[in-house]
Amino acid sequence: AASELKPRFIALASSPIPYMNGTDFPAIAEVTEQDTGIPTFAVPTNGMHDYVRGAGMALEAIAEHFVLPKSHAEDVSNKNTEEKGRNRLVNLLGVTPLDFGPLDHAETMKRSLEQYGWQINSMWAMGDSLDQLSKSADAAVNVVVSSVGLRAAKVLQRKFGTPYVVGAPVGRFTEKLSEAMEAAVSGEKEDNVVYAACRMSAENLQDVNDTKESPSHRVEMTLIGEPVTMGSLAAAIELQYSRSVRV
């Protein structure tokens, strides 16, 4: 199949039975790469966890194997920023159909950040090619928009020193996220999990902390779903509508 399709890489993912049998997928990957000449690696899934773990390990492997060192070429985006030499390139990590649905939703996130002067370098991994993902080291900051992207963010930080923040651009929360991205680029020490810090410091809640009612009675709505996207949505709701939200 590899000789016919000629893929850019081969990823070997496990399932419960091979996992319990102790199948040596890294060794199989090594032999496969030697035989085909195609980059091959194992993704140690076992069918016993949710999609966040498996998809996260897949993006982690892409970051480990295919992202090239930062280019020394002048970044065109720097010419368009108010502050000379400031890099406004950003990677969005964890953009999957399971969390964001159609590609149009991902494009909406891009436009939201572009309104604050950011330029999207790559989206992991909807709508971009492997070639574009390989240029991720050129970005000034990574934004983890879902839990799936966290592993890749840590790899890119370790290999290239790229800082990351956690949060999805939703409503009025996008401004807070942009501020955290700017702080990360400038080297300021801020809380990585932006939506959590934003919610804890929200000043627009209608006397939520002053009420004598129990916490269960204070909550006006509950969001159920992936932690980063739901946490970001909760922060946006609290900021815009002053309504307490539980995730």
Kindly label every feature range from the protein language model.
Residues 1-247:
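An N-terminal assembly and electron-transfer interface module characteristic of large anaerobic redox
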